[in-house]
């Protein structure tokens, strides 16, 4: 449309204010049709029955992310395990057996109880498998051979985190260990890599209250009015992996934790060696050659 014709069209007077309102209403933007507030007749005939059925059903069980669904006691729907949101439909009496006591009660506010506590896994055992991976037993090795083999096993792990952790630990402590400590460290390396990493790096659970936020003035002026939730700083915490009873009083685990503390930023000043303390675990050290 040309510019003079467009100006002439906009300058044309309307017939009446009512005509202007109806024109705007007819040309309003949007794809939704105008509906009256009274929608009682639009619901299906089965809506009341379905609503009553849903409200009378028991709440679905809460399954924490630390509860394995590959075990045989988890409810099945046909050949496969049911999704977590449909557990109550398959087995309304199912109680998840979480390895961490009190976690289910904490997340459900005491509404749901934990199932039967499972025994701690032994060496070579994993959730969901029916066999046991037995570690290799070596006999007749001298101290020099044991040190060389443990150095190799400390550097060639399954994940990068345990590679850095155990290789730096072996570089500092392996040459100072006696035969009994070497044998204990040999058994310790048979554990799963993620278990070793978390046992050495995690902080033990405390009895303190869960950290809570203090609402700031900015949030009171903006977030509180808009319905936004307050930030939950400190509410997230990684699942604690308890140390099994076989390593509760281990000297090797104590030295490994001390090694982590000495190489951390907070443990730099308390480190025994100022040359290596506080340097972190960012690099695998060079291969060490043992004389004996």
UniProtKB/Swiss-Prot annotation:
Alphabetical keyword list: Chaperone, Mitochondrion
Gene3D superfamilies associated with the record: Flavinator of succinate dehydrogenase
Keyword Hydrolase: no
Gene Ontology annotations of biological process type: mitochondrial electron transport, succinate to ubiquinone; mitochondrial respiratory chain complex II assembly; protein-FAD linkage; tricarboxylic acid cycle
Gene Ontology annotations for the cellular component aspect, listed alphabetically: mitochondrial matrix
Compartments where located: Mitochondrion matrix
InterPro entries referenced in this protein's UniProt entry, alphabetically: SDH (IPR005631), SDH_sf (IPR036714), SDHAF2 (IPR028882)
A Pfam family recorded for this sequence: Sdh5
Primary location: mitochondrion
Bias (Polar residues): 55-68
Residue segments, region Disordered: 27-68, 266-292
Domain of life: Eukaryota
Keyword Kinase: no
Additional remarks: This protein may be expected to contain an N-terminal transit peptide but none has been predicted.
Protein family: Belongs to the SDHAF2 family.
Job of this protein: Plays an essential role in the assembly of succinate dehydrogenase (SDH), an enzyme complex (also referred to as respiratory complex II) that is a component of both the tricarboxylic acid (TCA) cycle and the mitochondrial electron transport chain, and which couples the oxidation of succinate to fumarate with the reduction of ubiquinone (coenzyme Q) to ubiquinol. Required for flavinylation (covalent attachment of FAD) of the flavoprotein subunit of the SDH catalytic dimer.
Subunit structure: Interacts with the flavoprotein subunit within the SDH catalytic dimer.
The protein's name in its UniProt record: Succinate dehydrogenase assembly factor 2, mitochondrial
Source organism (scientific name): Aspergillus flavus (strain ATCC 200026 / FGSC A1120 / IAM 13836 / NRRL 3357 / JCM 12722 / SRRC 167)
